[in-house]
Amino acid sequence: MFSSNTFDINAYLLNLREDTTSIDISRKNLDCLPDLTRFTQLKKLICSHNNISYLPELPVGLLYLDCSHNNIKCITKLNESLEYLNCSFNIELSKMPLLNDKLMLLKCSDNDIGCLPPLKNIEMLCCPRNRLVSLPELPPTLTYLDCTNNGMRDFPCHRFHKGLKTVYCSFNKLTRLPEFNEELEKMICANNQLERLPILNDKLEILECENNKLICLPYFNNSLRWIDCSHNKLEKLPSFNNNLLHITCGHNKLKEIPTLPHLLDFINCESNRIEKLPALNRNLETLICSYNRLTVLPQLNNAVARLDCAHNKLMQLPVLNENMIQLNCTYNKINALPMFNDSLEIIIFSNNPIYTTLYGGNITLHHHRHSYMQNVMDMDEYDEFNTDSITSIRNLSQKVKTLNDFRFLFYSLKYKSCLRNFLWEKIRRPKIEAKYHPDNLHKLLETMSEDDDVSEMWIADN
């Protein structure tokens, strides 16, 4: 029976012409597929998101088949003409049939597959979240590979084939990677057991190798735009190229950061051992440097909008630019705050001397999560903000201005006499002593006689 409560598959198919080239019967609550062989011109069949448990014989000319999100347990044979197959999310599917020579794209993610057949002429292979411990030989036609979340320990080659451009192999047990080919543009190899990386090819643009066992990185090529090497054992980074836009290198053992490239707009170097940061480039928008050993911050450029410098040893902050939106400087030794701009939306500065100065310990913040920033500063994850515990930015700004004005007045008065004494001792006194020194008395007398002559002439004229 091929019907559901709302869809009659037989009636639907009877209304189709036999030369139909495309059929979409997805999400129809079907338990099985009817005979479709009479549609001799059928090229595309979508039967995803049903309850189908097996695939019947299909039209010989079929090129595109999407049977994902079903209950298929076995696929016995593929049409010789099939070019695209998506059989993902059939959680009991444990084996794939032999692939035909024309198949170019295979998606078989989120199944129970333990091994794959020879890949022949595959161009795109997506097989994440299976039980694969290895892959068959990778064909030279392959341009895209996603084998994320398996149990792989190695690749079946020493060097990626020339045409491969994108590789996702995170969440495996890989201890090494093949040499990168010349065309590789994107390598995502996070959450493995890698201790080193191959030399980066010239065209690589994106490298994500976080959560490994890396102790060093290869030199960065000039094309690299994005790197995430966080959660490793790195003690030093190679020099940054001028095209880098995004750097995430937190949770390592870094003591310093190389000179920042001109185009960089994001850097996260939290949870390291850094004592001093380099000068900030003019395009930087987000700086995350929490959980380090910083005692001073570099001057902020006009582009920085998000700054997290929590859990350091800072005693003061640099002047805030007009574009600052979010500031977190909690858990430092800050005893004074700079003036705020009108664009500032969120500031977190608890657990600093200045907080006690402004609020006298009467207003406290709840404990917050110690790590809340990944790719961007996400202040929404803070659960301690409420109307009883946070004063508006405007009121806080007024408090800071009043305090800063008072400090200026206090220190002006306190050091006024010191300044006067300093000027007397260093400038006026030496000049007076030199002028009236006995060695200079004859000069003084000459000056006095000239003064007398001038006085007599003035009296005579008047």
Question: Can you say where each PLM-predicted feature lies in the sequence?
Answer:
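Canonical leucine-rich repeat
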Residues: 33-36, 55-58, 75-78, 93-96, ...
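Leucine-rich repeat
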Residues: 16-20, 38-43, 60-63, 80-83, ...
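Catalytic phosphate/metal-binding cores of nucleic-acid and nucleotide-processing enzymes, i.e., regions
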Residues: 7-9, 13-15
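Conserved hydrophobic beta-strand positions in leucine-rich repeat
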Residues: 21-23, 45-47, 63-67, 83-87, ...
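LRR N-terminal entry segment and analogous cap-like coil->beta motifs
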Residues: 2, 14-52
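Cullin-RING E3 adaptor/co-adaptor recruitment helices
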Residues: 371-462
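Consensus "Asn ladder" position of solenoid repeat domains
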Residues: 28, 50, 70, 90-91, ...
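Leucine-rich repeat domain C-terminal region
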Residues: 311, 326-335, 341-412
